[in-house]
Amino acid sequence: MFTARMARPMANESAPAASFAAPGSSGAPVADCLLEVRGVGKSFPGVVALDGVQFRVRRGTVHALMGENGAGKSTLMKIIAGVYTPDQGEILINGEPVVLSGPLDALDRGIAMIHQELNLMPYMTVAENIWIRREPKNRFGLIDHAALRRRTAALFERLSIDIDPEADVRTLTVASRQMVEIAKAVSFDSDVLIMDEPTSALTDKEVSHLFRIIRQLREQGKGIVYITHKMNELFEIADEFSVFRDGKYIGTHASTDVTRDDIIRMMVGREITQMFPKEDVPIGDVVLAVKNLGVDGVFRDVSFELRAGEILGVAGLVGSGRSNVAEALFGVVPATAGEIRIDGKPVRITTPAQAMKHGMAFLTEDRKDTGCFLNLDLLANMEAAVLSNRYVKFNFVRQAQLKRDCEAMSRMLRVKTPGLHEEIQNLSGGNQQKVLIGRWLLTQPRILILDEPTRGIDVGAKAEIHRLVSALAGKGVAVLMISSEMPEVLGMSDRVMVMHEGRMTGIVERKDADQVRIMDLASR
């Protein structure tokens, strides 16, 4: 999939704005161009997020947007969706310059955005969420619920979505909520749909369904903007792609004209020589031993050992119970069965505080809901896990030392930020993830549990985190790494534990692990 030959030489990556052209043409005709951005710039305090960028979406195409975290992708999409106002430049819709006053104005003009962090109302029904503020009314001016159900059912039939319109959103899986968001965007009959990392929490089957919907929309003449870090998705679904780097536009190409390595070079401005820098380090004594661990109704009979310096990967399909095991180990949801031993001694862990006293750290899979304090700054986020240990003396926090260590950690992890007092919600997803990793490294853990450590992170940041994890293992940290990305599991793990429907189905040594064997165990 990644061996497509270059059909023509790569364009100059630093080409000026005037040289922009759609792939395979000398410039898309205005009638073919649904949306165009010219010379758009946007700055925040201490940060130039976009520097005179350009972008174009053509009718009946899927246009992927690629770039490292912090490249400016999300900022540009929020400008197009009316969330932000650009400091300079212009936006053209169907060839006409427009000034968007807000998201509702963008919707009225045919632009809908499906955010990575879903924006549904959990205590409302599926139908109510889709048609909010547009509900059909009866002759008394009240909501016509029968018409609402019929309208939703017709929309779902059109998109081959099998979800009960009357179900409360809070009862749906993440994948089902994603489909509801897509249906809501389609319900506006928008010409341009922006999808931000839409497959980050989907199974392979759900991704295939999503791609069928995208192809259907493309055939209807819609323009799809598809933000992703996954190379295989770009080659499978995108007609063309644009790359941004450090707030600048780098180039646009047809997806058939480039290789995976070409795109990585455009994204990071350098070669990534080793994506999975797993070091051969001495494996020490057993640090964590788990026997017949279980949580009633969730998972059962999970047994494994984790040694100092070892990276134990955990694989399995979405819903297999991988994250639940991590939560039980860390005391988020205490185990109801089984035994946990640390350094050979049985321990009972019913709270995260108890887990931390035993030298554990836990990076959760959902940085928005269970990781970041979005309204607080980097310093507050990074220090959150250490305020009860070595930085507190006689009930006083050693603020100066803590700040110095947080600054050093931020530099080591190469967090892109104006300073420690920047609100974390203003950072890209990859930089937020680095801050959370830094939070736990400050606790100097002996056992590090990582749940989807590189989800939603660009290829350059992935390699950085892989190097960091490998280095930690080299220092004797025992790492339990849960990941839905098969190359990551195979490339980084000394052994791979596989789960299916709440059961552990096997543990495979690194030398014996391959995708076929892991998937066989994951589907038993």
From Swiss-Prot:
InterPro entries named in the record: AAA+_ATPase, ABC_carbohydrate_import_ATPase, ABC_transporter-like_ATP-bd, ABC_transporter-like_CS, P-loop_NTPase
Domain of life: Bacteria
Main location: membrane
Assigned keywords, A-Z: ATP-binding, Cell inner membrane, Cell membrane, Membrane, Nucleotide-binding, Repeat, Sugar transport, Translocase, Transport
Enzyme Commission number, as recorded: 7.5.2.11, 7.5.2.7
Binding site for ATP: G67, E68, N69, G70, A71, G72, K73, S74
Subcellular location: Cell inner membrane
Keyword Transport: yes
Purpose of the protein: Part of an ABC transporter complex involved in carbohydrate import. Could be involved in ribose, galactose and/or methyl galactoside import. Responsible for energy coupling to the transport system.
Protein name from the UniProt record: Putative ribose/galactose/methyl galactoside import ATP-binding protein 2
Gene source species: Burkholderia ambifaria (strain ATCC BAA-244 / DSM 16087 / CCUG 44356 / LMG 19182 / AMMD)
Biological classification of the source: Bacteria, Pseudomonadati, Pseudomonadota, Betaproteobacteria, Burkholderiales
